[in-house]
């Protein structure tokens, strides 16, 4: 567990943080006065590290605009789903040449209308573990139930002409327990019918990168980001860790 490992490092008086056994130790003061890039071996103490909680190290990164953002919480997604459920599914958009639709009304007081659209391949439904479906009017709990059974789930809402993705603050795609997000700045969402091009492939794999591409979404990648402050008595150096 990285967090307990970092705490142990923090407690040790001196920790060798880099390898390079062939190099002699260089003081941080010398490194701070040098021009990059150079390769050094240091002997230093870990003064602080950020963030303090390991889960806060996970961010979303856009390789196109190089932005870093926080991973939205489940409450944000739930709020967007609730907002989209206000608009009832448009029956005119059901049962097209490339998806079959099922609609029902919930038995609770709200009597929500839910529609699920199962994408077909060669005019046939695929096995659940290979199926992409779209859901309108579902709650967070219902969406997660579907991800346990089906390969891909895309939350959508209906307009007069087509199904469309929700606000990009919500994941545009869920696969297993992974939520995939798009960059709001760099994405230009296309109509959902763009997915029919993948359904027409010989063996649709429903890969997130391909789905993002046909839907005009710039896919955000999960990255691991940390900052360490190292000291050795001659100076303090900030070291950043950034990794996919």
How would you label these PLM feature ranges?
Residues 1-222, 226:
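OB-fold nucleic-acid-binding modules
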Residues 232-234:
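Acidic/polar residues in short coil/turn loops that connect beta-strands
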Residues 240-244:
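A beta-strand/beta-hairpin structural motif
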């Amino acid at each position: 567990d990285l967090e307990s490992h970092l705490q142990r490092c923090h407690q040790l008086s001196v920790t060798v943080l880099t390898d390079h056994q062939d190099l002699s130790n260089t003081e941080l003061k010398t490194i701070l006065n040098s021009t990059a890039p150079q390769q050094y071996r240091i002997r230093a103490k870990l003064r602080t590290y950020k963030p303090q909680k390991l889960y806060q190290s996970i961010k979303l990164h856009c390789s196109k605009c190089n932005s870093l953002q926080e991973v939205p919480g489940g409450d944000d997604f739930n709020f967007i789903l609730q907002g989209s459920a206000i608009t009832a599914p448009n029956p005119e958009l059901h049962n097209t040449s490339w998806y079959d639709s099922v609609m029902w009304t919930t038995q609770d007081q709200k009597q929500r209308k839910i529609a699920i659209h199962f994408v077909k391949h060669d005019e046939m439904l695929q096995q659940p573990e290979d199926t992409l479906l779209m859901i309108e009017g579902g709650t967070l709990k219902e969406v997660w139930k579907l991800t346990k059974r089906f390969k891909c789930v895309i939350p959508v809402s209906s307009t007069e002409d087509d199904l469309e993705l929700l606000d990009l603050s919500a994941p545009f795609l869920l696969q297993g327990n992974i939520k995939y997000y798009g960059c709001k700045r760099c994405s230009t969402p296309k109509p959902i019918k763009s997915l029919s091009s993948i359904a027409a492939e010989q063996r649709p794999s429903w890969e997130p990168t391909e789905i993002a591409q046909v839907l005009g979404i710039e896919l955000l990648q999960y990255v691991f980001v940390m900052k360490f402050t190292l000291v050795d008595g001659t100076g303090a150096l900030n070291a950043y860790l950034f990794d996919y």
